[in-house]
Regions:
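Conserved small/polar residues in nucleotide/adenosyl-binding loops
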Residues: 196-197
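ATP-dependent carboxylate activation and anion-phosphoryl transfer catalytic cores
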Residues: 1-166, 170-178
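Class I SAM-binding transferase module
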Residues: 177-188
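P-loop NTPase catalytic cores that bind/hydrolyze ATP
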Residues: 191-192
Length: 197
């Protein structure tokens, strides 16, 4: 977004970098995934299964643990809160259960101990994004979105979107919520950008 700096100046909170191994000591970046990177939950689950089946293999070749990923992700998301509070409220925005990565959305929300929300759970109240809870609405400080840019806000992008939150881009521009990753970061996914890295 031209002329706008997101809260904390952070555009890319999470990146999924695809690597290809060309020799024993050489790796190349195949592509960058920063729009809505996906796949980490499968890696965590796969690693846990492999460790349970072959614990001696993991100790023998010194495979690093990935079990701390959800806690580190939550810490990074909270650190990007516009209010910079220790008790910032984080939520994961999912397109819903029919999305191919829904398992990951629910897995990460559960592992981080945050709410998994859909657009109908959210509302703009007094210039803030709030989620419905059994005790009423609760303000969200950081929204880890798993919804593509074009569907994020029907008032700013695709007007037919039922996956986004009407007015969320205005709230974002006001600086009262962090959206991870920032809308527009997907430009870095474009292969043409690899010339400039």
């Amino acid at each position: 977004m031209i002329g706008f700096t997101p809260p904390s100046g952070i555009y890319t909170h999470i990146a999924g970098i695809d690597l290809v191994r060309t020799s024993e000591k050489e790796f190349f970046v195949l592509e960058d995934n920063v729009r809505t990177p996906s796949g980490v939950s499968y890696m965590i689950e796969n690693r846990e299964t492999m460790y349970n089946m072959f614990p001696e293999l993991f100790s023998k070749i010194k495979v690093r643990s990935v079990t701390e990923y959800p806690a580190k992700l939550l810490k990074a998301l909270k650190a990007s809160s516009p209010q910079l509070l220790n008790d910032s409220t984080v939520a994961v925005l999912t397109p819903g259960m029919y999305n191919s990565a829904y398992f990951e959305h629910s897995f990460l929300a559960d592992q981080m101990g945050v709410e998994l929300v859909e657009s109908q759970d959210l509302q703009i109240i007094d210039g803030r994004v709030a989620m419905r809870t059994t005790q009423g609405f609760k303000i969200i400080d950081v929204l880890y979105r798993r919804v593509d840019d074009m569907f994020l806000d029907p008032l700013s992008f695709n007007e037919n979107s039922a996956l986004g939150v009407p007015g969320i881009m205005d709230v974002y521009k006001s600086g009262t919520i962090t959206i991870a990753n920032a809308p527009g970061t997907g430009i870095a996914d474009d292969k043409a950008c690899l010339l400039y890295t």
